[in-house]
């Protein structure tokens, strides 16, 4: 029987690559729901190719545009079209799906992920912000419902694979690798342009995660994600800069052995691993040639120039709603940088300033997390930044 798949964020970088994986395994998967924002033309193309029963978009206007496109081209194919928060949750809980790939950007992934877990769906998690903002709620819900949280980030997929069959108590350190971004080795970030920051040396990604990689905030969020996914204290999670991005992460055990996962810089590999789990599907990505590669290098991150890693440790130490505030403030800071409102270094200023103003609520429920998220976004939009 084909595995039913719902994809939240199907028109983004991860979503489109996931559909490519599914296209390469036609006998294994069936797409039952696709959710996107406002890229209705791309969603219409995906819908005509995979013919899911349910489509969801950002709002009623996007739904009307999508419906018009499909009426013109779809023949007898008549999917249900939903929109907004309700549509996203309906896609996440579609009765025919066994696995939900959550690849929407930002904290908007929290509610549909929790809804999917409550509906008993396994989760292929590409939305790290969900665990950053609501890690305790999400992991507790997954454990209570007996569903799997399967990481899609290449680093967390590597850790997941390296931990296979291991006693969690035997872990000494998680070694989380980072490319270092486009500004590795640069001490002065004054004057960094939008174009420079969007030029990642290794990975092709969406704009938000590319900027996060340039500030090392992506790695900061991944530290928090690893903390919740694997139950490892932050002090046992070490970030190591690895410019080649071939060793995707590793686990050091109490006996001194280190187990790592290596592979090409192609997100279709960890996506395929999560979709096929617990099996391994036959690969179609060009395999890694270690002889041609020649050498792998490693170095410490520069936390003075790139303070994001410190912000992550501070957020988890303070606990409660502080990680959600870190995440929300960063999302707005990146938006403001991309819009030309603040300089690149203003991202750090803005995030630190919003965190300084927040008094975290301990052991928050979903309502408290969402309230903190809204507060942080408002604060980040209003906060002045030195130019």
UniProtKB/Swiss-Prot annotation:
Enzyme's top EC category: oxidoreductase
GO molecular function annotation: 1-deoxy-D-xylulose-5-phosphate reductoisomerase activity; manganese ion binding; NADPH binding
Pathway: Isoprenoid biosynthesis; isopentenyl diphosphate biosynthesis via DXP pathway; isopentenyl diphosphate from 1-deoxy-D-xylulose 5-phosphate: step 1/6
Oxidoreductase found in the keyword field: yes
Binding site for Mn(2+): 153, 155, 222
Cofactor: Mg(2+); Mn(2+)
Organism of provenance: Symbiobacterium thermophilum (strain DSM 24528 / JCM 14929 / IAM 14863 / T)
GO biological processes: isopentenyl diphosphate biosynthetic process, methylerythritol 4-phosphate pathway involved in terpenoid biosynthetic process
Name of the protein described by the UniProt record: 1-deoxy-D-xylulose 5-phosphate reductoisomerase
């Amino acid at each position: 029987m084909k595995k039913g798949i719902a994809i939240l964020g199907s028109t983004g970088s991860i979503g489109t690559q996931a559909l490519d994986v599914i296209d390469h395994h036609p006998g294994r998967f069936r797409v039952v729901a696709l959710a996107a924002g406002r890229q209705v033309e791309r969603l219409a193309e995906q819908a005509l190719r995979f013919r899911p029963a349910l489509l969801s978009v950002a709002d009623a206007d996007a739904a009307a545009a999508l419906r018009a496109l499909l009426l013109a081209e779809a023949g007898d194919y008549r999917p249900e079209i939903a929109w907004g928060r309700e549509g996203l949750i309906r896609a996440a809980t579609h009765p025919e799906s066994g696995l939900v790939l959550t690849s929407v950007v930002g904290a908007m992934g929290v509610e549909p992920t929790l809804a999917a877990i409550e509906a008993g769906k396994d989760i292929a998690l590409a939305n790290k912000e969900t665990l950053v903002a609501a890690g305790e709620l999400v992991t507790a819900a997954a454990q209570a419902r007996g569903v799997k949280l399967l990481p899609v980030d290449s680093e967390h997929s590597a850790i997941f694979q390296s931990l296979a069959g291991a006693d969690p108590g035997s872990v000494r350190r998680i070694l989380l690798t980072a490319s270092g971004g486009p500004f590795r080795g640069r001490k002065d970030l004054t004057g960094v342009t939008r174009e420079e920051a969007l030029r990642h040396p290794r990975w092709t990604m969406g704009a938000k995660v590319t900027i996060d990689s340039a500030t090392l905030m992506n790695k900061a969020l991944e530290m928090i994600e690893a903390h919740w996914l694997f139950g490892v204290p932050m002090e046992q999670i070490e970030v190591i800069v690895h410019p080649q991005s071939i060793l995707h992460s590793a686990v050091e055990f109490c006996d001194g052995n280190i187990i790592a996962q290596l592979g090409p810089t192609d997100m279709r590999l960890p996506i395929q691993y999560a979709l096929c789990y617990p099996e391994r599907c036959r690969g179609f990505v060009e395999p890694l040639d270690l002889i041609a590669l020649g050498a792998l290098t490693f170095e410490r991150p520069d936390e003075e120039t790139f303070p994001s890693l410190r912000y992550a440790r501070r957020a988890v130490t303070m606990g409660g709603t502080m990680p959600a505030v870190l995440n929300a403030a960063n999302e707005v800071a990146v938006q403001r940088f991309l819009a030309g409102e603040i300089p690149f270094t203003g991202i750090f200023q803005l995030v630190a300033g919003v965190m300084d103003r927040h008094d975290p609520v301990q052991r928050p429920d979903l309502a408290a997390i969402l309230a903190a998220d809204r507060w942080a976004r408002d604060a980040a939009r209003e906060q002045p930044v030195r130019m």
